[in-house]
Amino acid sequence: MSLDRFTDRLCADSLAKPLGKVDRKFVQSMLKGISGSRSLNLTEIARALKENISLHATHKRLSRNLYDEALVENISERLLRLGSERVGPNTRLIVHVSELHKKFARKIEFLPIAEENAEAGFKVCEIIASEPESKTYFPLLTHVWSHEVPGFSSDAEEVFNSVRKVLHATSNQGMVFIDNGTVSQAACDMIFADRMINYMILVEDRSMQVRVRNDCFSLEQMLDRVETRYGKILYKLVPVGILGASQTDLDLFVHAGCSGVKIPSSGRPVNFISLRTKSSILEEHATPFLTTQTNLRSRKALMGLVDSFLSMGDILSMHRTLRDSFKPENFRVLSYKRLQLLMTLLAAVIGYEVSVSGDEMLTDQVFAKSPHDGQLQRTYLLPENDSVVLSR
């Protein structure tokens, strides 16, 4: 699919309030310029368009049209509608929160200033969708905010509202996947309290209480109560500097079990999953999950859900690599509205580039069922024949 054809689909009248000729041309120019320049800097975007007018005139046109609050909502709705058409009941809705920093910035609207004015940043919540065994994804929503934006209540509220917006567009189809590393416990608690949201969440707060019949237990206590019946060997690719001076392929024995519990805040019955990992050089580690997924009594169902969660890291890594190739921190707009629209248009370009790349993993899988290829430090011994093959 060409970028022009993707733009036509994004701007189709059926997706949202119809765009006028000026807005349609602007969207087409921005997608082409962002893709061609690999940048969110308006000067570089304008230069990539190579229009038969002065660079200053192109820049001025883009900047003027970028200041449009209605267009922010319109394009965001279009991108969400376009993606939500592909979301089914088992689609992973992966939630990731990051920060967009501008060092020594002073004049950007609603930009909170960090201590000593050295660094300041906006929060960005991205929700991307991926099928359970897929090696690709598609963006659904990018939401930008800061503590200074009028009406701000809390980061947790911003994340929760983003999740609800996506689920409204998908008619509550899809399962929210959260690795609590970037999403706060407060945001997770809001999701747990909602009886309609389906989720698979790694829970950092082990003191969180759940009900088993008439008794309450912390997740820490539940880890000891649940038998981890099903297990298998996985190989984890560990980055340089964690276990040594080179990449390491770590052999892991992964075993899991689950038990039915109730969430006190909602009274909703869910499954608690205990995931334990152990290697030849590391002690056993237990991780608690809560999920609304049912029918997890078989090995295939439970370990399949665990695999789906573990592979989420590969999808996020691929997304971060692609997103960062556009150097989003190099934006040079002063208004919050322009930044919102820039980030939404970037998500659209990412959606296009992912769609044309096909179902191919652009980065190494962190977790694999067999040893990773290459010259790696390994925590296990390879058979001689395998050693020859993997070193090629």
Q: How would you name each of these model-derived features?
A:
Residues 45, 126-128, 160:
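Short, well-ordered amphipathic alpha-helices
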